[in-house]
Every structure is written in structure tokens, then in C-alpha cells.
């Protein structure tokens, strides 16, 4: 992606998620995401809601839907990334909110937003079968696309 703004640190888009079973406790535990240094490119994370407000994800031992949300103030027209899930989680489906997407979540997917968008951009919905016994502290990760391994790619609205 020529002229793409890059999110400089994988940690700025990694959200620690509460994906675990509490030992005999049915009350899921929330884990707050780390402080994020949001730059012009914004941040991309995995949330339990389409607005990117709730990062609590729980292992219920069944089908669970999560959402990839790109939070950006100055606007973006596209992004490229890949997803790494904890051991035992099986992806059932991945649906982009936009018509143009190339690639896959394992090696890397590039998604065009169709126009300049800002705020909380709901990029994708992911449905997984959770194992019911995820190790505490396990995380889902948003990582760089394999074609551009140095950073997650974001096309700023000014780069159209």
C-alpha cells in the first residue's frame, strides 16, 4: 500500500481480551485493553461490540461473535492486517462490512472502506467456536499483513 500510514507498534493494536473460563465461576471477568498511543492512523482492535467500546471477550464453550473496529480521528479509506487467535479457537466465519476485500485473515487481508471514514469503523465480524477451556491471559492479536510485515497498514484519507 503505497503512501499508507503505518501503525508503528504492534502493541498499539493488540488488545488484551478476557478470553478464559474462571475456575468454576460463571461470572466472566473483564480485562481492560492497555493504554494505546493512537496516532494519525488510529488503532485496530477486536471487540465484543460493533462500536469498539467493549473489549471483554469470554470463552463460553460455544459460538461467539467478535468485531474488528478501526478507531481513527482524521479518517481512513483502507486497512491491511491479519488475526492470530488463541489455541483451540476455531474460526467459523469472517464477514467484511465492505465490498472490497482481498486476502484472508491468516496471511493478511486488505479491506477498502469505499470512502473516507472516521470515528469507530466496524470493519469485520468474526464468529468463532470457543473451546470452553482457554488458558487465562490468552489473547487475540491484530498483526501486520504478511506482505507488509513491519506494521499494520492504514491508508489515510489524504492519500487517496
Locate the predicted segments by residue.
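Bacterial N-terminal signal peptides that target proteins for export
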Residues: 1-11
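Acidic, low-complexity intrinsically disordered segments
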Residues: 25-160
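C-terminal motif of bacterial Sec signal peptides marking the signal peptidase cleavage site
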Residues: 19-22
